C-alpha cells in the first residue's frame, strides 16, 4: 500500500521544482490518510512519528512556492482514465469550525450540518460515472463578509485576510461562478465532459444555467419549488403609473409556468 501511495505522489507532485517539495508533499499526503479527526499540521506530524517534522510540513503547506493547479491537473488526468466520467457533479461541503481563525470561516448555511453554523464552505467538481466518482477541482468560498470591497464586509474578518494568506485580488465570487470557472479550468486540461449535474443551490441561478448553455454543456440541475418559467418569446412590460406610490415593476404578460 505504501509503495502504491509513493507512486501516486510521485506522479501528482512531479511538477514541483525541488526534491524536498516532492518529499514533503508525499509525507503530507500520508498524514491526511492517518487515523485521527484533526488534519492540521501539528497533530498529523505527531501521528507520523519519525517522518513528521512539524516545521517542514508547515513550511510546505503555508510558504513553499508551488502551484496547486498543476497537482489538480495530474489528479484529474489520472481519475479521468480510471473513471471514464460521463458527468461533472458540483457540490459544496461545509467544514465545521469552533473558532474564527481559519480562512473564510463564517456563519453560513451548510448541508453538512443542515443549518446555519460556523464553518468554511468549499465548492468541488467531481468526475463521475455509474461506478465511481472523484473530486478533482475545488475552491474555498469567500463570503462577502471577508471581501473588503463588499458593503457586507466585516472589519474583523477583513483584518484577518493577511494572516490567513488570502491574496489582495481575491474577493467574493458566487458559488455558481466558481463552478463555471472550474469547468473552464478542467477544459484547459483537455478534459471535456458534456453533462453537468448539480442541486438547487446552483440550478436556481439563471446565470449558471446560461453559462452552461454558452459552453454547450447539457445539464440536469435541481430548482426550488418556487421557481417559475416563462415562454421563450415572453417579454416583460411595465404597467402604467397611476401617479401614487412606488412605480410599478416590470411584469411578464402571461402566467408563469411551474
Question: Where does each model-flagged region fall?
Answer:
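Active-site-proximal, Lys/Arg-enriched surface segment
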Residues: 60-145, 149
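An internal, acidic/charged active-site-proximal segment
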Residues: 153-258
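Electropositive nucleic-acid engagement tracts
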Residues: 16-22, 28, 32-100, 218-220, ...
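Short, charged/polar micro-motifs that form catalytic or ligand-binding hotspots
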Residues: 15, 30-34, 47, 111-112, ...
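A short, surface-exposed helix-loop junction/capping segment
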Residues: 20-27, 163-164, 189
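Short, glycine/acidic-rich beta->alpha junctions
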Residues: 36, 71, 117, 200-204, ...
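Electropositive, glycine- and tryptophan-enriched low-complexity nucleic-acid-binding patches
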Residues: 55-59, 112-193
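Basic, low-complexity segments
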Residues: 1-16
Amino acid at each position: 500500500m505504501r509503495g502504491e501511495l509513493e507512486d501516486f505522489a510521485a506522479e501528482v507532485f512531479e511538477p514541483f521544482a525541488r526534491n524536498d517539495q516532492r518529499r514533503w508533499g508525499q509525507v503530507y499526503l500520508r498524514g491526511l490518510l492517518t487515523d485521527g479527526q484533526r488534519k492540521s499540521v501539528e497533530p498529523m506530524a505527531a501521528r507520523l512519528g519519525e517522518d513528521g517534522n512539524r516545521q517542514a510540513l508547515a513550511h510546505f503547506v503555508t510558504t513553499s512556492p508551488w502551484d496547486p493547479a498543476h497537482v489538480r491537473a495530474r489528479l484529474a488526468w489520472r481519475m479521468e482514465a480510471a473513471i471514464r466520467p460521463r458527468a461533472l457533479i458540483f457540490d459544496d461541503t461545509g467544514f465545521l469550525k469552533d473558532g474564527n481563525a481559519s480562512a473564510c470561516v463564517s456563519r453560513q448555511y451548510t448541508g453538512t450540518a443542515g443549518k446555519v453554523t460556523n464553518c468554511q464552505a468549499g465548492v468541488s467538481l467531481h468526475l463521475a460515472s455509474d461506478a465511481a466518482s472523484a473530486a478533482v477541482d475545488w475552491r474555498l468560498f469567500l463570503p462577502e463578509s471577508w471581501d473588503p470591497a463588499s458593503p457586507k464586509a466585516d472589519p474583523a474578518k477583513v483584518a484577518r485576510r493577511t494572516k490567513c494568506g488570502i491574496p489582495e485580488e481575491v474577493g467574493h465570487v458566487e458559488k455558481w461562478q466558481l463552478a463555471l470557472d472550474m469547468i473552464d479550468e478542467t477544459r484547459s486540461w483537455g478534459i471535456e465532459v458534456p453533462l453537468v449535474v448539480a442541486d438547487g443551490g446552483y440550478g436556481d441561478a439563471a446565470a449558471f444555467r446560461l453559462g452552461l448553455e454558452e459552453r454547450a454543456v447539457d445539464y440536469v440541475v435541481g430548482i426550488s419549488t418556487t421557481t417559475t418559467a416563462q415562454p421563450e418569446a415572453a417579454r416583460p412590460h411595465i404597467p402604467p403609473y397611476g401617479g401614487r406610490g412606488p412605480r410599478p415593476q416590470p411584469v411578464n404578460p402571461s402566467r408563469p409556468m411551474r
